[in-house]
Amino acid sequence: MALFRRPNWSALFEKIFIQKSFLGFCSLRVGCEIIIWFAIINKVSGLYGIVSLFQNSDASPWQVLMYVSSVLMLILFSWLAIHIPKSSVPHALILFYVYLIDFLLNVLFTVLFALSWFSKLVQSDSSSTEESADSDPSPSLLYLFFQAESIPSLLLLIFFASLKFYFVLITLSYSNKLIVDSGIRPQNLPPNFSGRVTRLLMKPYIMAANRSYLRNHTKRFTDSIELEQRLMDEVV
């Protein structure tokens, strides 16, 4: 008898990351629709950012990149808002990839702007203490980061980052549900443009995310064969 069992990574991934509903009472499809409209409202601010670039020439390259990416994401989310209610597997996968990229970009921009803001606090505080030679050394960036005034801002950043990560899991779970329910297999897709796009979208999803739909599809297929066999036996 083996002392150690090889962990079932696919089942563990499904148990931790695959959600059954949105907030415990809404379906995944309704959750994805809500997520898309929240994203559209959020990305509208990118339009105002583009306008502000023409009025302010002091914008950093990161700000320009953030505003441009917001406009591109606004276009993509507006397009996906039309197709997600139709329960389309390719569009559900596109939503997952787009929202994941948007989440990673938001984390990157948040970290960059937070570091820039706190570094300016350090510089302003150190310049105010330069007049006194015997004064204590200026506080470090880590000290200002965890000051009482900064803790609420830090908690808000963590809350919204956690909420967006949960939204990423919802989009992943919705695409997983559509794949499982439809029983789509990459090798069975048609050779047309739509089939090639769907196969391309499913390839990284299968490799890196979850292969449980293959197991579920096989189990469902086996159960249907057993049911047909029992019915045939009863008829005979």
Curated annotation (Swiss-Prot):
GO MF term set: inositol phosphoceramide synthase regulator activity
InterPro entries from the UniProt entry: Kei1
Keyword Transmembrane helix: yes
Major localization listed first in the record, in broad terms: Golgi
Membrane topology: Multi-pass membrane protein
Cellular component, GO, one term: inositol phosphoceramide synthase complex
GO BP of this protein: inositol phosphoceramide metabolic process; sphingolipid biosynthetic process
Pfam families assigned to the protein according to its UniProt record, in alphabetical order: Kei1
Location of the protein in the cell: Golgi apparatus membrane
Keyword Ion transport belongs to the record: no
Annotated transmembrane regions: 34-54, 64-84, 93-113, 151-171
This protein's UniProt keywords: Golgi apparatus, Lipid metabolism, Membrane, Sphingolipid metabolism, Transmembrane, Transmembrane helix
Subunit relationships: Component of the inositol phosphorylceramide synthase complex composed of at least aur1 and kei1.
Record PANTHER family: INOSITOL PHOSPHORYLCERAMIDE SYNTHASE REGULATORY SUBUNIT KEI1 (PTHR28077:SF1)
Function comment: Regulatory component of the inositol phosphorylceramide (ICP) synthase which catalyzes the addition of a phosphorylinositol group onto ceramide to form inositol phosphorylceramide, an essential step in sphingolipid biosynthesis. Helps the medial Golgi localization of IPC synthase in a COPI vesicle-dependent manner.
Family: Belongs to the KEI1 family.
Record's protein name: Inositol phosphorylceramide synthase regulatory subunit kei1
Lineage: Eukaryota, Fungi, Dikarya, Ascomycota, Taphrinomycotina
